[in-house]
Protein backbone atom coordinates (compact mmCIF):
# COMPACT_ATOMS: atom_id res chain seq x y z
CA UNK A 1 0.00 0.00 0.00
CA UNK A 2 2.83 2.36 0.93
CA UNK A 3 4.68 1.43 -2.27
CA UNK A 4 1.61 2.19 -4.40
CA UNK A 5 1.22 5.56 -2.68
CA UNK A 6 4.87 6.45 -3.29
CA UNK A 7 4.63 5.45 -6.95
CA UNK A 8 1.49 7.54 -7.39
CA UNK A 9 2.98 10.53 -5.55
CA UNK A 10 6.25 10.45 -7.49
CA UNK A 11 4.53 10.10 -10.87
CA UNK A 12 2.13 12.94 -10.04
CA UNK A 13 4.98 15.17 -8.92
CA UNK A 14 6.97 14.30 -12.05
CA UNK A 15 3.98 15.12 -14.24
CA UNK A 16 3.63 18.56 -12.63
CA UNK A 17 7.31 19.43 -13.00
CA UNK A 18 7.92 17.98 -16.45
CA UNK A 19 9.66 20.36 -18.84
CA UNK A 20 7.28 21.53 -21.57
CA UNK A 21 9.98 20.92 -24.20
CA UNK A 22 9.77 17.19 -23.47
CA UNK A 23 6.19 17.08 -24.74
CA UNK A 24 7.15 18.08 -28.29
CA UNK A 25 7.15 15.07 -30.64
CA UNK A 26 8.27 16.15 -34.10
CA UNK A 27 7.52 12.69 -35.50
CA UNK A 28 3.79 13.32 -35.15
CA UNK A 29 2.02 14.00 -38.44
CA UNK A 30 4.80 13.01 -40.84
CA UNK A 31 2.75 10.67 -42.98
CA UNK A 32 0.70 12.00 -45.89
CA UNK A 33 1.55 15.51 -44.70
CA UNK A 34 2.95 18.66 -46.30
CA UNK A 35 6.46 19.80 -47.22
CA UNK A 36 6.36 22.35 -44.39
CA UNK A 37 5.80 19.64 -41.74
CA UNK A 38 8.89 17.58 -41.04
CA UNK A 39 10.70 15.71 -38.25
CA UNK A 40 14.00 17.61 -38.36
CA UNK A 41 15.17 20.46 -36.13
CA UNK A 42 14.08 24.06 -36.66
CA UNK A 43 14.00 27.25 -34.63
CA UNK A 44 10.94 29.49 -34.30
CA UNK A 45 10.51 31.10 -37.73
CA UNK A 46 13.84 29.56 -38.71
CA UNK A 47 15.41 30.35 -42.06
CA UNK A 48 17.07 26.93 -41.90
CA UNK A 49 14.67 24.01 -41.58
CA UNK A 50 17.06 21.05 -41.67
CA UNK A 51 15.31 17.74 -42.13
CA UNK A 52 15.45 14.37 -43.91
CA UNK A 53 13.71 13.88 -47.24
CA UNK A 54 12.78 10.59 -48.89
CA UNK A 55 10.51 11.59 -51.78
CA UNK A 56 10.93 13.18 -55.18
CA UNK A 57 8.85 15.89 -56.81
CA UNK A 58 5.43 14.81 -55.60
CA UNK A 59 2.51 16.55 -53.95
CA UNK A 60 2.92 16.38 -50.17
CA UNK A 61 6.55 15.51 -50.80
CA UNK A 62 9.43 15.71 -48.37
CA UNK A 63 9.47 13.12 -45.59
CA UNK A 64 7.03 10.20 -45.56
CA UNK A 65 7.24 7.90 -42.54
CA UNK A 66 5.99 4.90 -44.52
CA UNK A 67 9.08 5.04 -46.75
CA UNK A 68 12.00 3.30 -45.06
CA UNK A 69 14.64 5.30 -46.88
CA UNK A 70 16.44 8.65 -46.66
CA UNK A 71 17.60 10.62 -49.70
CA UNK A 72 19.39 13.29 -47.69
CA UNK A 73 18.97 16.28 -45.43
CA UNK A 74 17.82 19.50 -47.05
CA UNK A 75 17.97 22.93 -45.44
CA UNK A 76 14.78 24.59 -46.69
CA UNK A 77 11.24 23.36 -46.06
CA UNK A 78 9.17 26.49 -46.62
CA UNK A 79 6.12 26.94 -48.81
CA UNK A 80 7.16 26.69 -52.51
CA UNK A 81 10.84 26.76 -51.46
CA UNK A 82 13.52 24.10 -51.09
CA UNK A 83 17.22 23.57 -51.58
CA UNK A 84 20.73 22.56 -50.45
CA UNK A 85 20.60 18.86 -49.67
CA UNK A 86 23.51 17.15 -47.91
CA UNK A 87 24.16 13.43 -47.54
CA UNK A 88 27.02 11.48 -45.91
CA UNK A 89 27.96 8.33 -47.82
CA UNK A 90 30.69 5.76 -48.42
CA UNK A 91 31.64 3.62 -51.41
CA UNK A 92 31.46 4.33 -55.14
CA UNK A 93 30.38 7.86 -56.05
CA UNK A 94 26.71 8.24 -56.96
CA UNK A 95 25.35 11.64 -57.98
CA UNK A 96 21.67 10.77 -58.36
CA UNK A 97 19.33 10.01 -55.46
CA UNK A 98 17.91 7.00 -57.27
CA UNK A 99 14.38 5.65 -57.12
CA UNK A 100 12.42 4.34 -54.16
CA UNK A 101 11.79 0.99 -55.86
CA UNK A 102 15.50 0.74 -56.79
CA UNK A 103 17.39 2.24 -53.84
CA UNK A 104 20.75 0.95 -55.05
CA UNK A 105 20.41 3.09 -58.18
CA UNK A 106 21.42 6.22 -56.26
CA UNK A 107 22.93 7.64 -53.11
CA UNK A 108 19.79 7.23 -50.98
CA UNK A 109 19.96 4.85 -48.04
CA UNK A 110 17.62 2.39 -46.41
CA UNK A 111 16.76 3.01 -42.75
CA UNK A 112 15.03 1.24 -39.88
CA UNK A 113 12.71 3.47 -37.88
CA UNK A 114 13.94 1.73 -34.72
CA UNK A 115 17.22 3.57 -35.31
CA UNK A 116 15.56 6.92 -35.89
CA UNK A 117 15.02 9.51 -33.16
CA UNK A 118 13.42 12.94 -33.19
CA UNK A 119 12.97 15.36 -30.31
CA UNK A 120 12.92 19.11 -29.96
CA UNK A 121 15.86 20.59 -31.94
CA UNK A 122 17.32 17.14 -32.65
CA UNK A 123 17.06 14.39 -35.22
CA UNK A 124 19.19 11.28 -35.71
CA UNK A 125 19.09 8.22 -37.92
CA UNK A 126 21.33 5.32 -38.87
CA UNK A 127 21.86 5.14 -42.64
CA UNK A 128 21.91 1.38 -43.11
CA UNK A 129 23.51 1.33 -46.56
CA UNK A 130 26.57 3.19 -45.26
CA UNK A 131 26.55 2.37 -41.54
CA UNK A 132 26.67 6.11 -40.85
CA UNK A 133 24.87 7.75 -37.95
CA UNK A 134 23.63 11.23 -38.86
CA UNK A 135 22.62 13.73 -36.18
CA UNK A 136 21.05 17.13 -36.87
CA UNK A 137 20.44 20.33 -34.92
CA UNK A 138 20.18 23.98 -35.94
CA UNK A 139 20.03 27.65 -35.08
CA UNK A 140 17.83 30.18 -36.88
CA UNK A 141 20.09 30.55 -39.93
CA UNK A 142 22.54 27.67 -39.59
CA UNK A 143 22.56 23.89 -39.61
CA UNK A 144 24.84 21.64 -37.58
CA UNK A 145 25.29 17.97 -38.48
CA UNK A 146 27.35 15.29 -36.75
CA UNK A 147 28.21 12.20 -38.79
CA UNK A 148 29.71 9.05 -37.28
CA UNK A 149 31.47 7.12 -40.06
CA UNK A 150 32.72 3.54 -40.39
CA UNK A 151 36.30 2.77 -41.40
CA UNK A 152 36.52 3.68 -45.09
CA UNK A 153 38.83 5.25 -47.66
CA UNK A 154 35.79 6.42 -49.63
CA UNK A 155 33.81 8.44 -47.10
CA UNK A 156 32.28 11.61 -48.46
CA UNK A 157 29.69 14.33 -47.97
CA UNK A 158 27.48 15.14 -50.95
CA UNK A 159 25.97 18.57 -51.66
CA UNK A 160 23.09 18.40 -54.15
CA UNK A 161 21.48 21.69 -55.21
CA UNK A 162 18.50 20.34 -57.17
CA UNK A 163 16.39 17.83 -55.29
CA UNK A 164 12.78 16.83 -54.90
CA UNK A 165 10.19 18.91 -53.08
CA UNK A 166 6.44 19.40 -52.87
CA UNK A 167 6.69 22.32 -55.29
CA UNK A 168 9.31 21.26 -57.86
CA UNK A 169 11.93 23.89 -58.51
CA UNK A 170 14.43 24.39 -61.31
CA UNK A 171 18.01 25.46 -60.72
CA UNK A 172 18.41 28.20 -63.29
CA UNK A 173 22.02 29.06 -62.48
CA UNK A 174 24.34 27.91 -59.71
CA UNK A 175 27.93 27.64 -58.59
CA UNK A 176 29.88 25.74 -55.94
CA UNK A 177 33.53 26.46 -55.13
CA UNK A 178 36.15 25.18 -52.72
CA UNK A 179 37.40 27.92 -50.40
CA UNK A 180 39.83 25.81 -48.37
CA UNK A 181 40.31 22.23 -47.23
CA UNK A 182 37.64 22.95 -44.63
CA UNK A 183 35.10 25.08 -46.46
CA UNK A 184 33.01 25.47 -49.60
CA UNK A 185 30.60 28.18 -50.72
CA UNK A 186 28.06 28.68 -53.46
CA UNK A 187 24.68 29.85 -54.62
CA UNK A 188 21.66 28.49 -56.44
CA UNK A 189 19.18 30.69 -58.30
CA UNK A 190 15.92 28.75 -58.35
CA UNK A 191 12.45 29.01 -59.78
CA UNK A 192 9.41 27.12 -58.54
CA UNK A 193 5.89 27.16 -59.91
CA UNK A 194 2.81 27.58 -57.73
CA UNK A 195 -0.07 26.12 -59.73
CA UNK A 196 -2.97 27.57 -57.63
CA UNK A 197 -1.74 31.14 -58.18
CA UNK A 198 -0.09 30.52 -61.56
CA UNK A 199 2.97 32.37 -60.31
CA UNK A 200 6.70 31.68 -60.52
CA UNK A 201 8.65 31.97 -57.29
CA UNK A 202 12.22 33.07 -58.05
CA UNK A 203 14.86 33.25 -55.33
CA UNK A 204 18.58 32.68 -54.77
CA UNK A 205 19.98 30.57 -51.96
CA UNK A 206 23.52 31.51 -50.92
CA UNK A 207 25.39 29.12 -48.66
CA UNK A 208 28.61 28.35 -46.84
CA UNK A 209 29.53 24.87 -45.56
CA UNK A 210 32.39 24.10 -43.19
CA UNK A 211 33.76 20.81 -41.77
CA UNK A 212 35.97 20.15 -38.75
CA UNK A 213 38.30 17.79 -40.63
CA UNK A 214 40.23 18.72 -43.78
CA UNK A 215 38.85 17.04 -46.86
CA UNK A 216 41.15 14.64 -48.70
CA UNK A 217 39.89 15.88 -52.04
CA UNK A 218 36.99 17.72 -53.63
CA UNK A 219 34.93 17.24 -56.77
CA UNK A 220 31.85 18.49 -58.59
CA UNK A 221 29.23 17.40 -61.06
CA UNK A 222 27.04 19.21 -63.58
CA UNK A 223 24.31 17.37 -65.47
CA UNK A 224 25.96 14.00 -65.12
CA UNK A 225 29.53 15.11 -65.82
CA UNK A 226 31.81 14.47 -62.84
CA UNK A 227 35.04 16.43 -62.36
CA UNK A 228 37.26 15.05 -59.59
CA UNK A 229 39.91 17.75 -59.95
CA UNK A 230 37.90 20.96 -60.17
CA UNK A 231 37.71 23.49 -57.35
CA UNK A 232 34.71 25.29 -58.83
CA UNK A 233 31.73 24.52 -61.04
CA UNK A 234 29.00 26.52 -62.77
CA UNK A 235 25.82 25.30 -64.35
CA UNK A 236 22.11 24.79 -64.20
CA UNK A 237 19.70 21.97 -63.38
CA UNK A 238 21.60 19.01 -61.88
CA UNK A 239 24.60 20.44 -60.05
CA UNK A 240 26.45 19.32 -56.94
CA UNK A 241 29.74 18.75 -55.16
CA UNK A 242 31.40 16.28 -52.82
CA UNK A 243 34.06 16.26 -50.11
CA UNK A 244 36.16 13.09 -49.82
CA UNK A 245 37.66 11.73 -46.58
CA UNK A 246 39.49 8.76 -45.11
CA UNK A 247 37.78 7.72 -41.88
CA UNK A 248 38.45 5.32 -39.04
CA UNK A 249 35.77 3.21 -37.36
CA UNK A 250 33.53 5.47 -35.31
CA UNK A 251 35.22 8.67 -36.48
CA UNK A 252 33.06 11.79 -36.27
CA UNK A 253 33.03 14.50 -38.92
CA UNK A 254 30.93 17.56 -38.19
CA UNK A 255 29.39 19.89 -40.75
CA UNK A 256 28.20 23.44 -40.23
CA UNK A 257 26.12 25.20 -42.88
CA UNK A 258 24.56 28.62 -43.18
CA UNK A 259 22.27 30.11 -45.79
CA UNK A 260 21.23 33.59 -46.87
CA UNK A 261 18.93 35.08 -49.47
CA UNK A 262 21.23 38.11 -49.84
CA UNK A 263 24.82 37.01 -50.49
CA UNK A 264 27.55 34.48 -49.74
CA UNK A 265 29.16 37.05 -47.46
CA UNK A 266 25.94 37.28 -45.47
CA UNK A 267 25.72 33.49 -45.23
CA UNK A 268 29.25 33.43 -43.83
CA UNK A 269 28.33 36.16 -41.34
CA UNK A 270 25.29 34.13 -40.29
CA UNK A 271 27.58 31.16 -39.68
CA UNK A 272 30.07 33.14 -37.62
CA UNK A 273 27.54 35.05 -35.52
CA UNK A 274 25.05 32.26 -34.81
CA UNK A 275 27.36 29.26 -34.67
CA UNK A 276 30.88 30.57 -34.11
CA UNK A 277 30.49 30.99 -30.37
CA UNK A 278 29.70 27.29 -29.94
CA UNK A 279 32.84 26.09 -31.69
CA UNK A 280 32.27 22.49 -32.73
CA UNK A 281 30.13 21.64 -29.70
CA UNK A 282 27.06 20.01 -31.24
CA UNK A 283 25.39 19.40 -27.90
CA UNK A 284 25.79 23.05 -26.88
CA UNK A 285 23.97 24.18 -30.02
CA UNK A 286 21.19 21.71 -29.33
CA UNK A 287 20.90 22.89 -25.71
CA UNK A 288 20.75 26.52 -26.83
CA UNK A 289 17.98 25.73 -29.31
CA UNK A 290 15.92 23.87 -26.70
CA UNK A 291 16.28 26.78 -24.27
CA UNK A 292 15.02 29.21 -26.91
CA UNK A 293 12.02 26.99 -27.54
CA UNK A 294 11.32 26.73 -23.82
CA UNK A 295 10.80 30.50 -23.68
CA UNK A 296 7.99 30.21 -26.23
CA UNK A 297 6.37 26.95 -25.17
CA UNK A 298 6.29 27.85 -21.48
CA UNK A 299 4.21 30.98 -22.12
CA UNK A 300 1.15 28.72 -22.16
CA UNK A 301 0.40 26.43 -19.24
CA UNK A 302 -2.40 23.89 -19.38
CA UNK A 303 -4.28 22.14 -16.61
CA UNK A 304 -6.00 18.79 -16.72
CA UNK A 305 -5.86 16.36 -19.59
CA UNK A 306 -3.67 13.32 -20.04
CA UNK A 307 0.02 13.17 -20.88
CA UNK A 308 -1.00 12.31 -24.43
CA UNK A 309 -3.19 15.43 -24.58
CA UNK A 310 -0.22 17.53 -23.48
CA UNK A 311 2.00 15.89 -26.07
CA UNK A 312 -0.45 16.76 -28.83
CA UNK A 313 -0.99 20.31 -27.55
CA UNK A 314 2.67 21.29 -27.23
CA UNK A 315 3.58 19.60 -30.50
CA UNK A 316 0.95 21.64 -32.30
CA UNK A 317 2.08 24.78 -30.49
CA UNK A 318 5.61 24.00 -31.71
CA UNK A 319 4.43 23.54 -35.29
CA UNK A 320 2.91 27.02 -35.49
CA UNK A 321 6.11 29.15 -35.46
CA UNK A 322 8.04 26.47 -37.36
CA UNK A 323 5.78 27.12 -40.36
CA UNK A 324 6.95 30.73 -40.63
CA UNK A 325 10.29 31.96 -41.91
CA UNK A 326 12.55 34.77 -40.79
CA UNK A 327 13.98 36.39 -43.93
CA UNK A 328 15.74 39.22 -42.04
CA UNK A 329 19.48 38.89 -41.59
CA UNK A 330 21.86 39.60 -38.75
Question: Can you name each region flagged by the protein language model?
Answer:
Residues 16-330:
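Accessory carbohydrate-recognition regions in carbohydrate-active enzymes
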Residues 1-17:
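Bacterial Sec-dependent N-terminal signal peptides
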Amino acid sequence: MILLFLLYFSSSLWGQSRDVTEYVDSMIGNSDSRWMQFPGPAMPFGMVKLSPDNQGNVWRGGYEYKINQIIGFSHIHSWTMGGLLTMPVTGPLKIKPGEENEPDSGYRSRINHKNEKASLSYYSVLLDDYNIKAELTSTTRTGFQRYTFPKSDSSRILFDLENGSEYPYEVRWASISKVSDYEIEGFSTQSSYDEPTNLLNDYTVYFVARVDKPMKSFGTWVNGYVDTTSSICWGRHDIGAFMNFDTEEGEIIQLKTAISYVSIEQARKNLEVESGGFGWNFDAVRKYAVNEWRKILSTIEIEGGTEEDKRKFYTNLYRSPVGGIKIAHI
